[in-house]
From Swiss-Prot:
<feature type="binding site">
    <location>
        <position position="162"/>
    </location>
    <ligand>
        <name>(2R)-2-phosphoglycerate</name>
    </ligand>
</feature>
<dbReference type="GO" id="GO:0009986">
    <property type="term" value="C:cell surface"/>
</dbReference>
<dbReference type="InterPro" id="IPR020810">
    <property type="entry name" value="Enolase_C"/>
</dbReference>
<dbReference type="GO" id="GO:0000287">
    <property type="term" value="F:magnesium ion binding"/>
</dbReference>
<dbReference type="InterPro" id="IPR020811">
    <property type="entry name" value="Enolase_N"/>
</dbReference>
<dbReference type="InterPro" id="IPR020809">
    <property type="entry name" value="Enolase_CS"/>
</dbReference>
<keyword id="KW-0479">Metal-binding</keyword>
<dbReference type="GO" id="GO:0005576">
    <property type="term" value="C:extracellular region"/>
</dbReference>
<keyword id="KW-0963">Cytoplasm</keyword>
<feature type="active site" description="Proton acceptor">
    <location>
        <position position="334"/>
    </location>
</feature>
<keyword id="KW-0460">Magnesium</keyword>
<dbReference type="GO" id="GO:0004634">
    <property type="term" value="F:phosphopyruvate hydratase activity"/>
</dbReference>
<comment type="pathway">
    <text>Carbohydrate degradation; glycolysis; pyruvate from D-glyceraldehyde 3-phosphate: step 4/5.</text>
</comment>
<feature type="binding site">
    <location>
        <position position="363"/>
    </location>
    <ligand>
        <name>(2R)-2-phosphoglycerate</name>
    </ligand>
</feature>
<protein>
    <recommendedName>
        <fullName>Enolase</fullName>
        <ecNumber>4.2.1.11</ecNumber>
    </recommendedName>
</protein>
<keyword id="KW-0456">Lyase</keyword>
<dbReference type="InterPro" id="IPR000941">
    <property type="entry name" value="Enolase"/>
</dbReference>
């Protein structure tokens, strides 16, 4: 296998106009891998550390320190490594950093190199990334969980829930799912417009109307699904990312004008699941409320997937604690929360081994990098969350999945409704 001869990085812009790291890894056979690192708006306190410069430049959000760490320390460390030994490369990066949360070199520096190394190795092997990572059995196309209404930290609307998603579960293929999602998205625009609400967009391409409540936003989406000619619950299901840590203050959930306990929030979710065809609720409770998650999973876990994002931060140790406590039943997979590919692989493997579902995810600050599309197929996630079917940094991932589906041909299988507990048994 080819050896790494050069590693470098540069500062580029993400989809929110903030700097991020782009890393490149070069091999001695001419192969090269490039990776752009995403960045989140609502970040969990347990995430790996994103290194920013501070000061006035880019309002303190520059990443020149992280870039310098790649160009100097990391480049020196990885010279001569065999590119196909991903675990050894990632272990070397973790050891070089020397901190628990990758705060010395920066998770944004480490992740960029980790992904770029895998891409270079895939090119050297003459394989697409999904096949290089996932092997010959990588063939399941994920259900696109399309965020078509943005609230919370992703928008300037009054809606507290951060993401309202549609899941085209009734499609026969990924390409059909994408078409259904796009048609509902366009129908939603006309529904919102007809009610005199704003059709402005949030960070992830979804609309950000001033809906009165969570139910009002869900009603808009149900109307759009019907207007597009589809049946809610049969063709298209709904999903929520509550991101509840964002409105948890002083021991209470400040939700829709009131102050609520975890028990009261659980009642809210039970009502929503009873009224709407919801298949997934992400981060329904504050990120350290283990007891609350266990109770909620016991109550609702057989009906919907309870997804840990800020709760698990793609961290195998936190996920293991969740498994032990029967807290949540699905893992949101964000490579930049943990900071290397192999740690991400370990988290997904642990989830699958214990019957937890997995959803590959973008961040609200994205680049045109399509790695997560390949990883969703490679790791058999069955679900991917990468925004609305609009804005090129979101669509880039969907388009990559179209290419993968076409390349797989008859071997391709679309996960569809089988991906969700509401349709099991």
């Amino acid at each position: 296998m080819a050896d790494i001869i050069h590693v470098m990085a540069r500062e580029i812009l993400d989809s929110r106009g903030n700097p991020t790291v782009e890393a490149e890894v070069f091999l001695d056979d001419g192969a090269r891998g490039v990776a752009g690192v995403p960045s989140g708006a609502s970040t969990g306190v347990h995430e790996a550390h994103e290194l920013r410069d501070g000061g006035d430049r880019y309002l303190g959000k520059g990443v020149l320190k992280a870039v310098e760490n790649v160009n100097e320390e990391i480049a020196d460390e990885l010279a001569g490594f065999e590119a196909d030994d991903q675990r050894l490369i990632d272990q070397a990066l973790i050891k070089l950093d020397g901190t628990e949360n990758k705060s010395r070199l920066g998770a944004n520096a480490i992740l960029g190199v980790s992904i770029a190394a895998a891409k270079a190795a895939a090119e050297s092997a003459g394989l697409p990334l999904y096949r290089y990572v996932g092997g010959p059995n990588a063939h399941v196309l994920p259900v696109p969980m399309m965020n078509i209404v943005n609230g919370g930290a992703h928008a300037d609307s009054g809606v507290d829930v951060q993401e309202f998603m549609i899941a085209p579960i009734g499609a026969e293929s990924f390409s059909e799912a994408l078409r259904i999602g796009a048609e509902v998205y366009h129908a939603l625009k006309s529904v919102i417009k007809s009610k005199g609400l704003s059709t402005g967009l949030g960070d992830e391409g979804g609309f950000a109307p001033e809906a009165e409540s969570t139910k009002a936003a869900l009603d808009l989406i149900i109307e759009a699904i019907k207007k597009a000619g589809f049946e809610p619950g049969k063709d298209v299901a709904l999903a929520l990312d509550v991101a509840s840590s964002e409105f948890f203050k002083d021991g209470k959930y400040h939700f829709e004008g009131g102050e609520h306990t975890a028990e009261e929030m659980a009642k809210v979710y039970e009502e929503l699941v009873a009224k709407y065809p919801i298949v997934s609720i992400e981060d329904p409770l504050q990120e350290d409320d283990w007891e609350g998650y266990t109770k909620l999973t016991e109550t609702l876990g057989d009906k919907v997937q309870i997804v840990g994002d800020d709760f698990f931060v793609t961290n195998p140790a936190r996920l293991q604690e969740g498994i032990d406590k029967k807290a949540a039943n699905a893992l949101l997979v964000k490579v930049n929360q943990i900071g290397t590919l192999t740690e991400t692989f370990d988290a997904v493997e642990l989830a699958h081994r214990n019957g937890y579902r997995t959803m590959m995810s973008h961040r609200s600050g994205e680049t045109e990098d399509t790695t997560i599309a390949d990883l969703a197929v490679a790791l058999n996630c069955g679900q991917i969350k990468t925004g609305a079917p609009a804005r090129s940094e979101r669509v880039a991932k969907y388009n990559q999945l179209l290419r993968i589906e076409q390349e797989l041909g008859d071997a391709a299988v679309y996960a569809g409704r089988s991906a969700f507990p509401r349709f099991q048994g």
